[in-house]
Amino acid sequence: MPDMLVNLLKLPGDETLTDALRKENILIRRALTPDYYRVLPRITQLMGENAAGEANACFSRIPVSLFLATQGAKVVGFACYNATAPDFFGPTAVDPAYRGKGIGKALLIRALRAMREEGYVYAIIGGAGPVGFYESAVGALPIPDSEPGIY
């Protein structure tokens, strides 16, 4: 899986997407430190211990570099950035029962926007699995010779 590069100056808007999610009571928000003990086990369920370890690192940052998709008290998705390396997006996952609603795209755009607000101009998606998704969602480009990457 190649790493991918995203130009943060050309991110699409997400207002229509987040408005549609709100109608289903799904909110995209930055995690807060009090979420820690509730969120890490859920990330382990969704993606495994390695992802939970990366999310753990996100909670040590101010602001926390982790966004959540929630429906009520239930965490249905997450997206991290600056977890394993500076300027890297990921890991990210959405509960299989909630896929196809645009949650992953909304989390991606929200996290990349936060990176832009923190001064980054480009972001790297490390070991990008769904290359086509990242290309269409945010115009990400595969980085030549990026395999094997940091992961």
Regions found by a protein language model. Give the residues of each.
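Conserved acetyl-CoA-binding loop-helix of GNAT-fold acetyltransferases
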Residues: 94, 100-113, 117, 136
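Conserved active-site alpha-helix within GNAT-family acetyltransferase domains
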Residues: 1, 105, 117, 128-151
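Conserved hydrophobic beta-strand within the GNAT/NAT acetyltransferase core sheet
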Residues: 89, 123-127
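A conserved beta-strand-loop-helix scaffold within acyl/acetyltransferase catalytic domains
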Residues: 44-96
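A short beta-loop-alpha structural element at the N-terminal edge
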Residues: 27-39
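Acyl-donor-binding surface of acyltransferase catalytic domains
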Residues: 1-23, 127, 148-150
